[in-house]
């Protein structure tokens, strides 16, 4: 009997070893693919602003310069994205709008991240009534219609960037707070936090030095999604005429200027729109790569 069991045990051991080897190879392949995804996303989101800086140095074309003798030109070497109804070079306007869109996206996302992480960490670490108050506020913010919320701030501050900055920041922090609080509930029970308390470290030092660094990873993924969302929101508001005001170029307003000619001159709204999509895909790839690398089971969509 013992002799019969020995071969079966050996076979089971070999099968287990092969399964473990397959899992290791799969994990290694996923980590490599996540790195490729992150690099590709970075190439896109860095390449667009770099091009917006370098290309105007090579092309002496002003974004607001009008040429009524060259209106509605097809894409060409001289005008890769064509010209609009008053003869302005569309590519020059897209590149002129790039710094503004990135600035709004990064500034509002960073502000939301800082506010949300602090409030979420406080709620998760201390719990009790403070946790209840903060999380009920988060529930209210998330339940409120996003675009209506931002439009309310624009109504208060007037059309332009001020209301957009405030609206995007005030609304966006709730998502970071919810994720941070969920992570903090687990982190506060870890042994290194208990050891820090035993050593008599202050609560602020425990939070800043030991707890917060361990809740930031999932927030990086949320930050990529928020960046995409904020850039798209700015473009949407400018498309509707309540965002960036003329003559300042903005991706959404450029698409709005070309929508009238969609059937006859399709490139006017389509090519700037593709730039918006490309940037959104770039940030989403970075977020997906981070999620894969650290094992988070959610994905970003544009």
Where do the PLM segments sit?
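Transmembrane alpha-helices
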Residues: 99-115, 204-236, 283
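Non-cytoplasmic
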Residues: 148-152, 160-165, 169-175, 219-254
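Glycine-rich helix-loop "coupling/hinge" segments at transmembrane-helix boundaries
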Residues: 153-157, 184, 233-276, 299-302
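C-terminal transmembrane helix and the adjacent membrane-cytosol boundary/short C-terminal tail
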Residues: 171, 217, 221-227, 266-302
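Transmembrane alpha-helical segments of polytopic membrane transport and secretion proteins
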Residues: 1-46, 285-302
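Transmembrane alpha-helix signature in integral membrane proteins
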Residues: 90-125, 279
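Short helix-to-coil transition segments within interhelical loops
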Residues: 83-88, 125-126, 185, 195-214, ...
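Generic hydrophobic transmembrane alpha-helix motif, especially the helices
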Residues: 80, 84, 114-115, 124-187, ...
């Amino acid at each position: 009997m013992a002799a019969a069991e020995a071969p079966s045990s050996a076979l089971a051991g070999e099968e287990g070893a092969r399964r473990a080897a397959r899992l290791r190879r799969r994990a290694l392949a996923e980590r490599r693919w996540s790195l490729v995804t992150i690099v590709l996303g970075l190439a896109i989101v860095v390449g667009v602003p770099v091009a917006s800086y370098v290309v105007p140095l090579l092309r002496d074309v002003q974004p607001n310069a009008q040429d009524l003798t060259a209106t509605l030109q097809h894409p060409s070497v001289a005008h890769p994205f064509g010209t609009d109804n008053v003869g302005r070079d569309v590519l020059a306007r897209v590149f002129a709008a790039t710094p503004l869109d990135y600035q709004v996206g990064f500034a509002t996302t960073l502000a939301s991240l800082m506010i949300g992480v602090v409030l979420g960490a406080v709620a998760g670490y201390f719990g009790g009534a403070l946790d209840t108050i903060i999380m009920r506020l988060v529930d209210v913010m998330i339940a409120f219609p996003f675009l209506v919320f931002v439009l309310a701030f624009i109504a208060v501050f007037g059309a332009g960037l001020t209301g957009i900055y405030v609206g995007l920041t005030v609304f966006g922090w709730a998502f970071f707070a919810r994720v941070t609080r969920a992570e903090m509930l687990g982190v506060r029970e870890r042994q290194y936090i208990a050891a820090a308390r035993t050593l008599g470290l202050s609560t602020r030092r425990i939070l800043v030095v030991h707890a917060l660094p361990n809740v930031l990873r999932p927030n990086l993924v949320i930050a990529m999604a928020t960046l995409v969302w904020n850039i798209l929101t700015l473009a949407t508001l400018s498309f509707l005429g309540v965002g960036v005001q003329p003559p300042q170029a903005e991706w959404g307003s450029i698409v709005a200027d070309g929508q009238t000619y969609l059937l006859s001159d399709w490139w006017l709204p389509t090519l700037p729109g593709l730039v918006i999509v490309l940037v959104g895909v770039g940030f989403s790839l970075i977020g997906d790569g981070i999620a894969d690398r650290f094992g988070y089971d959610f994905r970003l969509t544009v």
